[in-house]
Amino acid sequence: MRNFLCLSLALAAGAAHADAPAAAAAAVAPPGLQASQLAIVINDAEPNSVEVGEYYRKAHGIPAANVAHVNIPNRPRKLSIDQFAQLKERINAQLKPEIQAVLMVWSAPYAVECNAITAAFTLGYDGDQCAKTCDPGKPSKYFNSEAAQPYTQLGLRLSMLLPVDFVEEAKAVVDRGAVSGFSVPAASAYYLTTSDAVRNSRAGFFPPAGVVRQRKLTVKNLKADSLEGAQDIMVYQTGQAKVAKLDTLHFLPGALADHLTSFGGDLQGSSQMSSQRWLEAGATASYGTVSEPCSYWQKFPNPTVLLRRYLSGSTALEAYWGSVLWPAQGLFIGDPLAAPYAGFRR
């Protein structure tokens, strides 16, 4: 408990040292990411991207002017540095200055060399990380940030990817994200310490068990390799190469779920469970690394920070991005605008 309290105080103190212009901007800006500030990037070479992109726009009431179009044939898993530079230039040329975040509507590409495409887009390509993927990463300016307008205040356009391999599954993710803010359900956040010691590196950051009454949320810490039969999941974080019994679970709209493993972000890989399986099981957003990160907790969502941000009313995009200290290899997927606790945002 002492470690948890010390961590919380340290993070809060770090967030308090925002510069004066940033604080002033936050004071006059809308609280948090708005639909009008999100751009949707559609791959015109992929029919699923076109269909799901338009579905997303209508579901969240995003202006048609916020839609950017690119053409990426053949669904490559990975882009070279030059290919990515050209893609990013095409996207940025279509974005208005007030755009704070971007949703890429496709399943692939999802990597730029060893970087995840979302990290490369938001932070810029990190070649040093690719020299040795098991080295420590570079800190993100957005980690635990209270910046309400990340592009305006920090020069960072947060990004997420919505996989579209199966149109109906992608639309189901969108539906869950769109309804997530309508009411606050009674829910649970599950944190599993598994028998896989290497993949338990962030277990020390699991929030303590208890009840957050205002949010109707119960925090549960379990020593188990999998969760079975839970029907009230808002958060599920664990450490396993493959997570069993997902078909027995029910995720509530807006649920976040991820597993600490090497290749969760390798959406087309088969050696470990893809983070996309979480979305298929009913989660609304997830995270995974696209290249071998080694088990640094800093390369994965910090459970304490993630929960605090989400319960404070952040969107899934803001909560997930703000919870990863070294995100170069990490792919953020799902519906960025999901925000089941938006009513609590100040």
At which residue positions do the language-model features occur?
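Cysteine-dependent hydrolase recognition
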Residues: D19-R346
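N-terminal signal peptide c-region/cleavage motif recognized by signal peptidases
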Residues: A13-H17
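Sec-dependent N-terminal signal peptides
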Residues: F4-A12
